[in-house]
Amino acid sequence: MTIKLKCLSHTPLRGLNDPAPEVIAEVDAVLARARADVEAFDPELIVIFAPDHYNGLFYDLMPPFVIATAAKSVGDYMTLPGPLSVERDLALELARFILDHDVDISLSHRLQVDHGCTQTLEELTGSLTRYPVIPIIINSVAPPFAPYRRIRRLGEVVGQFIATLDKRVLVLGTGGLSHEPPVPLLEGAPEAIGEFLICGRNPTPEARAARQERTIAAGKIYGTELSAQTPLNAEWDQAFIDLLLDARLDAVDDFSIEEISKEAGRSTHEVRTWVAAFAALAAARGGYSAHRDYYRPINEWIAGYGVMSAEPR
């Protein structure tokens, strides 16, 4: 078994509300290097930890985390639509392994995924189908949330499973860092919004377009006095990156969900995917060497935008 890790932010506003050209050029260069790394590694399996943004998972049944044996992209925000090349039998085997190790993961045989999963696959592989993949979706936007220690434990068990494989495995985490887009909360929501959050699958093209326009509008004023959203917090982001660089993964056990939401934004909890990915790497091969490939707070994209890579020592 050989394993590598990439963790990176995603943003639905890429190409829709862009920052200055020099910032885009920086990000493009970083992603080009990451793609080259993936190409050279040529993974035989990708395990991706990703969030959902009320496109596949809703409050009618909201699991803290779910593994998919089949997945299809909804194609939101300029991402590719269509099926992912999910390794069904191996995903089932992984689900059984996780359950046998006392982590109560949910299972989906027909999961819809959104840009939170697919944008990173596109950016690193150019496709949704180039490599076999196992998606694991971690609830990161719909409170109440599982504590961070459970996310770390999930990653550890996935890493233990990966260690049994005779494959080149790429582990991906996608989301964060600090950010707060206009994602509604169920508590106190008007009836129509509450109904969407409970069972809003398969919206009309008009409804999806309206949702996209609201996000674009939020991006145009994000970080200014006109925005009601929690601003980006570069200090929090850098401290989180340092934690991963130093392999202090057990420190996340003390993370306060309420404090993170207040200090860095409610959607910052997408960093759970990074926690799971690094925990998987550490459990699969022990110590690791990590690299801060890029970080920049980008208001136009509503993202503390970061990229990290890691491999066993």
From Swiss-Prot:
Top-level EC class as recorded in UniProt: oxidoreductase
Domain of life: Bacteria
The protein's Enzyme Commission number: 1.13.11.16
GO BP term (any one): 3-phenylpropionate catabolic process
Catalytic activity as recorded in UniProt: 3-(2,3-dihydroxyphenyl)propanoate + O2 = (2Z,4E)-2-hydroxy-6-oxonona-2,4-dienedioate + H(+); (2E)-3-(2,3-dihydroxyphenyl)prop-2-enoate + O2 = (2Z,4E,7E)-2-hydroxy-6-oxonona-2,4,7-trienedioate + H(+)
Molecular function via GO: 3-carboxyethylcatechol 2,3-dioxygenase activity; ferrous iron binding
Protein family membership: Belongs to the LigB/MhpB extradiol dioxygenase family.
NCBIfam families: PRK13370.1-2, PRK13370.1-4
Function: Catalyzes the non-heme iron(II)-dependent oxidative cleavage of 2,3-dihydroxyphenylpropionic acid and 2,3-dihydroxicinnamic acid into 2-hydroxy-6-ketononadienedioate and 2-hydroxy-6-ketononatrienedioate, respectively.
Stated name of the protein: 2,3-dihydroxyphenylpropionate/2,3-dihydroxicinnamic acid 1,2-dioxygenase
